[in-house]
């Protein structure tokens, strides 16, 4: 068996096209264009690339994009004050603060300062809690994008045995909640998990988000499983690889996401979807 590739790049492009059409329709109806504020503190190269991609995608769909590139020395107090301003700005529907933040700024304080109705990253405890209670509104972008990828396969998720490898607040934990909501029997694995191989070999659906190149051997993948590889790791020779050993996994899986071009584009597409949702549901 050779897996079908789940083309996140193409699916994300389709979403952006639909969003652009919706923005055009809003303008023609005399409605406001959605606005996204993107805040970057410091000069982390990877963060600069991510933020650049988000701003470009905003412009492509016709959103207003407001950029704040702040020096590493920017204080926590000043950042919270900026968030307060944007919370009160009626032209801004979404506020995104690129993580990680410098050591002197507490991530949780910043995340919780963003008003839940403008939390388009889906990180605020209110929005995570809504997902946990099965009434999601603004959902965490990467898991939301992954669910779109899984739906694109046409596979019925109800009753699937799913394994999530990684338990971060950004991907692993909300991913577990999304899969529960989709009717999966879900196991979350982390650094203390025993018998990881056994759990993965039994899984119909595997989502891996640990940030370690080739962490999951391809031969562990059950024949016919769906493999979602969230990892994006640059090797010394410059090659980008995922957390799963792709070549062997692709021989066992029924569907697999490539790296790059799988999950990454969907995270940004979901961010844009959340921004339009916030405009329509909360701010119109």
Swiss-Prot record:
Gene Ontology biological process terms, A to Z: L-histidine biosynthetic process; methionine biosynthetic process; purine nucleotide biosynthetic process; tetrahydrofolate interconversion
GO CC annotation, single: cytosol
Xref: InterPro entries: Aminoacid_DH-like_N_sf (IPR046346), NAD(P)-bd_dom_sf (IPR036291), THF_DH/CycHdrlase (IPR000672), THF_DH/CycHdrlase_cat_dom (IPR020630), THF_DH/CycHdrlase_CS (IPR020867), THF_DH/CycHdrlase_NAD-bd_dom (IPR020631)
Key words of the record: Amino-acid biosynthesis, Histidine biosynthesis, Hydrolase, Methionine biosynthesis, Multifunctional enzyme, NADP, One-carbon metabolism, Oxidoreductase, Purine biosynthesis
Keyword Amino-acid biosynthesis: yes
EC numbers on record: 1.5.1.5, 3.5.4.9
Subunit-structure text: Homodimer.
Function: Catalyzes the oxidation of 5,10-methylenetetrahydrofolate to 5,10-methenyltetrahydrofolate and then the hydrolysis of 5,10-methenyltetrahydrofolate to 10-formyltetrahydrofolate.
Protein name stated in the entry: Bifunctional protein FolD
Organism expressing this protein natively: Shewanella sp. (strain MR-7)
